[in-house]
Amino acid sequence: MASMISAEKRNPAIVILDFGSQYSELIARRIRETEVYSLVMSYTTSADQLRSLKPKGIILSGGPGSVYEEGAPYCDPEIFNLGIPVLGVCYGMQLMVHELGGSVKPAAGKAEYGKAPLEVDDPTALLTNVISGSTMWMSHGDSVQKLPKGFVRLAHTSNTLEAAIALHDKSFYGVQFHPEVVHSTHGMVVIRNFVYDICSCEPDWTTNLFIDEAVSQVQQHVGDKKVLLALSGGVDSSTLAFLLNKAIGPQLTCMFIDQGFMRKGEPEFLMSFFDEKFKINVEYINARERFISQLKGVTDPEQKRKIIGREFIRVFEEESLRLGPFDYLAQGTLYPDVIESSGTNIDPKTGERIAVKIKSHHNVGGLPKDLQFKLVEPLRRLFKDEVRKVGKSLGLPDEIVRRHPFPGPGLAIRILGEVTHEKLNCLRDADLIVREEINNAGLYNKIWQAFAVLLPVYSVGVMGDQRTYAWPIVVRCVSSEDGMTADWSRLPYAVLEKISNRIVNEVEGVNRVVLDITSKPPGTIEWE
């Protein structure tokens, strides 16, 4: 596959060495929130490579391994001789202890998962301004049994004696909890202390700076070549359209492929918004029948995603011959897309991520190997909230910037089982009601996603003294900061009642509404 362009040219102030944690990219995001640039790299990165990058700090991420087991991932031990501050998080702390002469064993009592009060023993350096009793997020089955020479305890919990440690004279620190997770109430204080007080970083990573660097890199790589953008109308592709328009102007052609799986009224809104209001040329391609015919009889969700991804690119290739030629395909791929499609486990022999898939994403999992385009993906290192900030800075209005995330395969993966015209029409009407009532209640901007799901089973009901057999609709509303983790939104009963009453009365083919109250993990936000 052709090379990818992403906005990453500068040296990072903080390097995160990834040992397979699901939160490695989240650490990078938290650091960027402090306006300091960070980069995630493989744990196999050598000390010499790190020295050449000249970072001001190194973070060793968590991971699923145990340092005392054969095949556990280890970093280059020379990293501890670079004279650079190091913060070990969870597995990273255990690794540092193990490498520097301490010992790690399975937790003597029980594994510690979830929230735990942190009792601060030494409120200095890393734990400055961290209030004793603050809630921190734990996720570990091993514990430090013996500290290396010179290390001191900074904090403990009821189950973990060495919850935070330090070797002050070398600026080595470790925390058994995850400060990057939103559940850690003073986690950002810990991160800021490390980034600013210990590593002496300067705040030089801002939204406008990202835009300037992304524009410059796109211009450098694309040159005078033409770029074709897959425009969906969501915040990701819309932000990308504005960014590329700023970078290369008339070299950009936006193409909206209506695959028939959009929400109600979206194709019309998209065309009028970009073409009429912002004068950005958008080529409209009606491929509804092509897509749905390819899904006939298909019930496996992974197959649906692959087929939609394949057809999506094929249409692009065909239309590019008519409109082009084009050299580059632009995609609004984000960090969570890449993480969930590649898995997070690490092969200790190669240092590569093992593809333990959660599910393939439309942007990255459905691409055919014979793809004829080079890829332009300047947003692939950003989280959703960062993309919204970029879009806002580029001039996108709130009606686009604040739109809820919508999957590339659209309603096709919110209909469990086979996709039909009848089911699509039913789901569109139900989904519109969910979003209308959420908006009417003033909750739209307080919720990460709110949508409907159609189940491929029949539920018995009674309407007008008649027995009915119709589809149930699932209402899915979640709160999140980045899509990596999510919790179900506690909607007022009055809002839920309106949604339910309207759906069963206004949507043909539905006689039951249920509420999904599953968090992520263990579930995912989407049902397929």
From Swiss-Prot:
UniProt KW keywords: ATP-binding, Glutamine amidotransferase, GMP biosynthesis, Ligase, Nucleotide-binding, Purine biosynthesis
Enzyme Commission number(s) from the entry: 6.3.5.2
GO-annotated molecular function: ATP binding; GMP synthase activity
Domain (Glutamine amidotransferase type-1): residue spans on this chain: 13-204
Metabolic or biological pathway, per its Swiss-Prot or TrEMBL entry: Purine metabolism; GMP biosynthesis; GMP from XMP (L-Gln route): step 1/1
Ranges for domain GMPS ATP-PPase: 205-403
Matching Gene3D superfamilies: 3.30.300.10, 3.40.50.880, HUPs
EC class name: ligase
Cellular component annotations (GO), alphabetically ordered: cytosol
Catalytic activity: XMP + L-glutamine + ATP + H2O = GMP + L-glutamate + AMP + diphosphate + 2 H(+)
Signal sequence region: none
Pfam families in UniProt: GATase, GMP_synt_C, NAD_synthase
Binding residues annotated for ATP, in chain numbering: S232, G233, G234, V235, D236, S237, S238
Function: Catalyzes the synthesis of GMP from XMP.
The protein's name in its UniProt record: GMP synthase [glutamine-hydrolyzing]
Gene that this polypeptide is encoded by: guaA
